[in-house]
């Protein structure tokens, strides 16, 4: 996982080949949670839970990097 810092206010983390800001990651986690609540087939449910765990780890790394940069 890599962190990209464009300025003091634009810190992004890489997740699956794309760079995300904190609000984008939070929105993505929320959307996947909504899909889980609406019901998914077993395989898709397992993948969604894995994605949430990965995105939460990326979000934690991003928040840590933002805290260290202040």
Regions found by a protein language model. Give the residues of each.
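Short intrinsically disordered terminal tails
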Residues: 1-7, 61-70
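N-terminal acidic leader/helix
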Residues: 2-37
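Intrinsic-disorder-associated interaction segments
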Residues: 14, 18, 44, 48-52
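Charged, low-complexity interaction regions
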Residues: 34-46
């Amino acid at each position: 996982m890599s962190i990209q810092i464009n300025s003091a206010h634009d810190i992004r983390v890489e997740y699956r080949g794309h760079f995300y800001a904190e609000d984008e990651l939070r929105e993505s986690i929320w959307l996947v949670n909504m899909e889980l609540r609406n019901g998914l087939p077993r395989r898709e449910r397992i993948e969604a839970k894995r994605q949430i765990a990965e995105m939460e780890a990326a979000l934690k790394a991003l928040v840590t990097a933002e805290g260290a940069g202040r």
